[in-house]
Amino acid sequence: MKKLAISIGDINGIGLEILVRSHEELSKICTPFYFIHESLLDKASKLLNLKLFNAKIVAFKDGKDYEFNFVKKENSLEIYSFYLPLDFKVDENFEIKAGEIDTKSGLYGFLSFKAASYFVYEKHAHALLTLPIHKKAWEDAGLKYKGHTDALRDFFKKNAIMMLGCKELFVGLFSEHIPLAKVSKKITFKNLSIFLKDFYKETHFKKMGLLGFNPHAGDYGVIGGEEEKIMEKAIAFVNAFLHSKKDEKFFKKALKDENLQKELLLNFKGKGVYLPHPLVADTAFTKTGLKNCNRLVAMYHDLALAPLKALYFDKSINVSLNLPIIRVSVDHGTAFDKAYKNAKINTKSYFEAAKFAINLHSKA
């Protein structure tokens, strides 16, 4: 079976309860390695009145050699150690504060995530599944990252792409956790062309559409000009480049050379993988709109995620593309209001994420 490295997220939220409640079923489809120390797992288990049996847990420690070792078997748990450069002291001896933003739980969740990421990178597991973190807890802990995807870019020096959804609808985000006021400045021919090229090469979706940035997709330039001045040009260029089968070196050269762009367009005949014009966002998510195209790109976060979660909240997942590792996540937050209350918690997104990672690795 495929091996999944699972980071615990913010332990003050619902992540650990999802992990414990789902372990038996999850173990039927993969071999999970949970990145949590035994002492902290014991505290959480007592609060939840739930016990984790027949599981593998990894105690992550600061070190230089990425060494992975079996330590012992105790109370049906297989305990391992994994050493990596962490830049922070690992503190597992803190109190769990259910439903609260806390610097210690924020930092611990980050270190669990970093260790699990490199565990996969070092080929000890096939994919990474992350449970939800709290961004404010990360910030209060002195971390510079806005979330998992932002951190993965830094870890691996790659331009990670965030994609969310399910088989009925997937959406790639051109911009993620940045203020709305900064999005328009990010939309340039170069930035968008690189994104569209990379998004296709990671997904190989056969038909994709870009959601317009402005209301009514700009109404032929009446409302803003990004659609006609930038987006349509980037779409045409990327469609022509993908059709040409030329290499990455040519792409980088053509980005700066209008004559090469014109040459590509002259030689391009037929349909591209991207629809030629941006879609009007307020109708793209209707039944008719999704029947036409259900693989979309959004210029900013809420343009896509508000309708996606309204339609498919329970089954949507988060996928990080364009990285040297496979990373998936649940598409929901820490749910502090439900943490450690034995509330009814939906685990569908968790299982969908695990299945997606397993299938993606099988196709790789």
UniProtKB/Swiss-Prot annotation:
Cofactor dependency: Zn(2+); Mg(2+); Co(2+)
Protein origin, superkingdom: Bacteria
Cross-referenced SUPFAM superfamilies: Isocitrate/Isopropylmalate dehydrogenase-like
Enzyme class: oxidoreductase
GO molecular function, one term: NAD binding
Residues bound to a divalent metal cation: H177, H216, H301
PANTHER family cross-referenced by the UniProt entry: 4-HYDROXYTHREONINE-4-PHOSPHATE DEHYDROGENASE, D-THREONATE 4-PHOSPHATE DEHYDROGENASE
Family: Belongs to the PdxA family.
Name of the protein in its database record: 4-hydroxythreonine-4-phosphate dehydrogenase
Substrates-to-products reaction catalysed: 4-(phosphooxy)-L-threonine + NAD(+) = 3-amino-2-oxopropyl phosphate + CO2 + NADH
Binding of substrate, residues: H148, T149, K309, N318, R327
GO CC term (a single one): cytoplasm
Pfam families: PdxA
Additional information: The active site is located at the dimer interface.
Keyword Zinc found: yes
Subunit relationships: Homodimer.
Keywords per UniProt: Cobalt, Cytoplasm, Magnesium, Metal-binding, NAD, NADP, Oxidoreductase, Pyridoxine biosynthesis, Zinc
GO BP, sorted A to Z: pyridoxal phosphate biosynthetic process; pyridoxine biosynthetic process
Main function: Catalyzes the NAD(P)-dependent oxidation of 4-(phosphooxy)-L-threonine (HTP) into 2-amino-3-oxo-4-(phosphooxy)butyric acid which spontaneously decarboxylates to form 3-amino-2-oxopropyl phosphate (AHAP).
